[in-house]
Curated annotation (Swiss-Prot):
The keyword Coiled coil is annotated on this UniProt entry: yes
Keyword Hydrolase annotated: no
Family: Belongs to the GOLGA8 family.
The entry's keywords: Coiled coil, Golgi apparatus, Membrane
Primary location: Golgi
Coiled coil: 82-173, 212-440
Localization per Swiss-Prot or TrEMBL: Golgi apparatus, Golgi stack membrane
Biological process according to GO: Golgi organization
UniProt protein name: Golgin subfamily A member 8B
Residue ranges of the region described as Disordered: 1-82, 95-125, 398-419, 460-492
Bias (Basic and acidic residues) ranges: 100-124
């Protein structure tokens, strides 16, 4: 609009100038004609006019020269103004082009910023997903720890049962001696009852053996499952570590690209500031002293307004760039924090791998328990052989008791007495051998218990605040205590097992070393049988405090006939149970595998 108005004004001025020039250029004849027309009806007036024509022509020429000089000046001024207006139009066009370029650059920068924000949001979403996966892995590792501790406790229970079985074997040795002495005096009716009780106890022992076999198979299957899960978790951790490394590399590359873009933006802002300074300098240049026209002043005001607006837009762009730089700084700080968190997570993953390696140690403990079970079975076989030998010795003694008169030698011969002495010496040697085996087994079990307790107490991250001789059988549940309480409970179980085992074998050795029960080497056969009866009474007194009475009708009949029959028969049933399934106790304990799988069902 401003250009059109300026051009229209210039065209109108040119037309006026041409009309004025045409009017003033042929001015002399036209004026003469007008004067002659005004005065020329009479010849007198014409003569008088001819006299004054020379004076009029001179005055007209002088007035024409005076009028032509300002017209030429006005034409020059108009030409200069037209040149200035064309220059201003050119500057306006260039400024408009610069404005369009700046707007285009602003749009491109806005698009780039939007893309950066989208990328940052995607990265934040990926980080949140990784955090959730990490939490899931933590929960799975927690449940794995609890299940492994539960299996450790079960292995300790099995070790305690082995100790009880060895203790019962020692008690059964002495109870067999008492049974051999007491069965001679019992009628045949009691033998039928004892057979019925033995059958019942055999059936119970067979059932318990089946249950224990199922329990052992379940334990083996659960151990296999735990090992497979551990391998799967290790593979998952390796894959996630590789993913984390790839993502860290991508993040570092994106940070480098952001830095380069920031540098490019700063250079662009500097260039824009330079262009602004140049435009301001051009605007600040002084105009020529010629007074511009009204239209040029209006156009200059419009140009100044446009320049101010462009300057405001550039300032806004500079402010936006500053805000973007601040946001980039904040993003860099966040990226640094995320890198630190990732490093911490990597360290935690390494610690978890170490803990998984530590959790693999219970497998070696189970293998050691298997070796211990094998050694205990070997000891039991040796004890059985010794029992058989003792039975043979007892048979020889009973045969010697039945025929005492026929076996009495003459006063000058000592063959039979020497045979009895040999038998008694063999019996004493066998007892000493049994005692040595029992002492070696006790020392071995004590050392193993102390090693396990020391290992549990010296584990990293655990404490033994609640360890006491009576605190045992802590179940590995997710809501009962924690790692410290479980380790302390396990230590207490080990201490309690060692204490009970040592107490039982102490009683056994005290009964074995009782001088009242040992026969003298030179005593005859009836005195030896009396000592055996006394020793049977001692065994009965020690067994009645530790063994519960039987149930049913056999309880009443046996208690009326003989008070020693009840514990002896029960011990015989348990011995048969040990022979069928050696290495395990008599108490059947079917475990509950709920703690290791409850959290999965809840999920």
């Amino acid at each position: 609009m401003a250009e059109e108005t300026g051009q229209s004004k210039l065209a109108a001025a040119k037309k006026k100038f041409k009309e004025y020039w045409q009017r003033n250029r042929p001015g002399v004849p036209a004026a003469a004609k007008r004067n002659t027309k005004a005065n020329g009806s009479s010849p007198e007036t014409a003569a008088s006019g001819g006299c004054h024509s020379s004076e009029a022509s001179s005055s007209a020429s002088s007035s024409l020269h005076a009028r032509q000089s300002p017209c030429q000046e006005q034409a020059a001024v108009l030409n200069s103004r037209s040149i200035k207006i064309s220059r201003l139009n050119d500057t306006i066009k260039s400024l408009k082009q610069q404005k369009k370029q700046v707007e285009h650059q602003l749009e491109e920068e806005k698009k780039a910023n939007n893309e950066k924000q989208k990328a940052e949001r995607e990265l934040e979403g990926q980080i949140q997903r990784l955090n959730t996966e990490k939490k899931k892995l933590n929960t799975d590792l927690y449940h794995m720890k609890h299940s492994l501790r539960y299996f450790e406790e079960e292995s300790k229970d099995l070790a305690g049962r082995l100790q009880r079985s060895s203790q019962r074997i020692g008690e059964l040795e002495w109870s067999l001696c008492a049974v051999a002495a007491t069965q001679k005096k019992k009628p045949d009716g009691f033998s039928s009852r004892s057979k019925a009780l033995l059958k019942r106890q055999l059936e119970q022992s067979i059932r318990e053996q089946i249950l224990l076999k199922g329990h052992v198979t379940q334990l083996k299957e659960s151990l296999k499952e735990v090992q497979l899960e551990r391998d799967q978790y290790a593979e998952q951790i390796k894959g996630e570590r590789a993913q984390w490394q790839q993502r860290m590399r991508k993040m570092s590359q994106e940070v480098c690209t952001l830095k380069e873009e920031k540098k490019h933006d700063t250079h662009r802002v500097e260039e824009l500031e330079r262009s602004l300074s140049r435009l301001k300098n051009q605007m600040a240049e002084p105009l020529p002293p010629d007074a511009p026209a009204v239209s040029s002043e209006v156009e200059l005001q419009d140009l100044r307004k446009e320049l101010e607006r462009v300057a405001g837009e550039l300032q806004a762009q500079v402010e936006n760039n500053q805000c973007i730089s601040l946001l980039n700084r904040g993003q860099k700080e966040r990226l640094r924090e995320q890198e630190e968190r990732l490093q911490e997570q990597q360290e935690r993953l390494r610690e978890r791998e170490k803990r998984l390696q530590q959790l693999a140690e219970p497998q070696s403990d189970l293998e050691e328990l298997k070796h211990e079970n094998k050694s205990a079975l070997q000891l039991e076989q040796q004890v059985k052989e010794l029992q058989e030998k003792l039975g043979q010795v007892m048979e020889t003694l009973t045969s010697a008791e039945k025929e005492p008169e026929a076996a009495v030698p003459a006063s000058g011969t000592g063959g039979e007495s020497s045979g009895l002495m040999d038998l008694l010496e063999e019996k004493a040697d066998l007892r000493e051998h049994v005692e040595k085996l029992e002492l070696g087994f006790i020392q071995y079990r004590r050392e193993r218990c102390h090693q396990k307790v020391h290992r549990l107490l010296t584990e990293p991250g655990d404490s033994a605040k609640d360890a006491s001789p009576g605190g045992g059988h802590h179940q590995a549940g997710p809501g009962q205590g924690g790692e410290e309480g479980e380790a302390a409970g396990a230590a207490g179980d080990g201490v309690a097992a060692c204490g009970s085992y040592s107490e039982g074998h102490g009683k056994f050795l005290a009964a074995a070393r009782n001088p009242a029960a040992e026969p003298s080497p030179g005593a005859p056969a009836p005195q030896e049988l009396g000592a055996a009866d006394k020793h049977g009474d001692l065994c009965e007194a020690s067994l009645t405090n530790s063994v519960e009475p039987a149930q049913g009708e056999a309880r009443e009949g046996s208690s009326q006939d003989n008070p020693t029959a009840q514990p002896v028969l029960q011990l015989l049933g348990e011995m048969q149970d040990h022979q069928e399934h050696p290495g395990l106790g008599s108490n059947c304990c079917v475990p509950c595998f709920c703690w290791a799988w409850l959290p999965r069902r809840r999920r």
